[in-house]
Amino acid sequence: MRPGKKLLAVCVLCSLASGCATLDVPREPSQVLPATGSVFGRSIHAQAAPYQGRSGFRLLSNSTEAFTARAELIRNAQTSLDLQYYIVHDGVSTRMLVEELLKAADRGVRVRILLDDTTSDGLDTIIATLAAHPQIQIRLFNPLHLGRSTGVTRAAGRLFNLSLQHRRMHNKLFLADNSVAIVGGRNLGDEYFDAEPNLNFTDIDMLSVGPVAEQLGHSFDQYWNSALSKPIDEFLSSKPSIKDLQNTRTRLEESLDETRKQNHALYQQLMTFKTAPRMDIWRKELIWAWNQALWDAPSKVLAKDEPDPQLLLTTQLASELRGVSKELIMISAYFVPGQPGLVYLTGRADAGVSVSLLTNSLEATDVPAVHGGYAPYRKALLEHGVKLYELRRQPGDNYGSGPHLFYSKSFRGSDSSLHSKAMIFDRQKAFIGSFNFDPRSVLWNTEVGVLVDSPELAGHVRELALQGMAPALSYQAKLQDGKIVWVTEDNGQMHTLTQEPGSWWRRFNAWFSTTVGLERML
């Protein structure tokens, strides 16, 4: 998801204070704590030992599991929690996680939270209130240094420094005791956990246990200790006090109690991490495999133009992309191949590789402008035999029942949009992370993910992709008499559409992004 909403991480009732930039304050580097420093970490270490360097993986393919896993990791953590996110939106799910983070800090767990600066727009004081806890540290990545006080000055500041400010930290990482991590496409917010009344994102996360978590810990440290990461209190004229934090906690408790009374079903659904914990069960279901954690260097965002290839996640993934020989399946919520991607995909298809892509349709995407960057490439891709599947808008239950992707219907009748990012190479390896197949992920934003060498795990991810490509869920774009048509299924009957589904406003947004040449920024 692209930025557009604002974060309210803890206390929607707190008042905002004007912020100002201050001089950089010298700070000590900080590293992940040893995985063996806690009982939980040692239990993971003992579980992983027989697998001789392999790590354990389990997909979290539905929103309930994804939320429960995060909440349970906070509860299990004994020494450290490291969170790195592009977007954190206010909502019931976020408030529950914040409450658990505060409880973890109370019992002595060190909590480090690294947020992309766009998350904090206009909310520095609110976010910084959390950091008043002695066990919680919060930093912002690639922050705007001047003009933070109002929305207007922030917009102006980003515009005047656009070459740096459009480059964002898109990473999503959740790490407990340097032993268990969650990677994937989900940010934090109700729309990612099936708790938002207007939109639910269909996504894939992966529970990652053992040595891979330590690799991801190194990734977190690189970003945390980067010169681009600044403590949030550097942007405040005065720091929130312990009393401010206590007031926030009181309001947080009142808010969650109100949710319990007013929306008891949703409250109970999210609280299953307390009533029916699953972590011990999931640990027995892990797939143990060789793997590689991949991430962009934080300094990628400092490049004057295109970054040095040595800094890029895609360079680390290049051997897999080049080496695929039989089947390549890609899931990318935002897909803009550009000329290099077009050459790569058509080249693989021409070499006899079965290439299939699942992305959002125009009617389903939350960013129609990105669809405008994808649409001009469809015909060339289809001419070379690349199979294109565009996920249909999946209406919530208020709009009728029907098939839904990844075995999940929205709890509150919300429409669903694809937000997943994954690749499957020759049914042997799977890559899951925050990376979209578009110029923004390749060149401008930073990303993180894990490549797993396991036919079993690759098979699970492939099954999810094929489910999404089913004609009842997606439009398959095809060529008919030289023109693109969309083949789909309704009520068991196949039919062909000659006009792309989507409202006139979505069409206009897609057309506009193409017309003004935004592709390289998408």
Residue ranges with predicted function:
Residues 9-18:
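Bacterial N-terminal signal peptides
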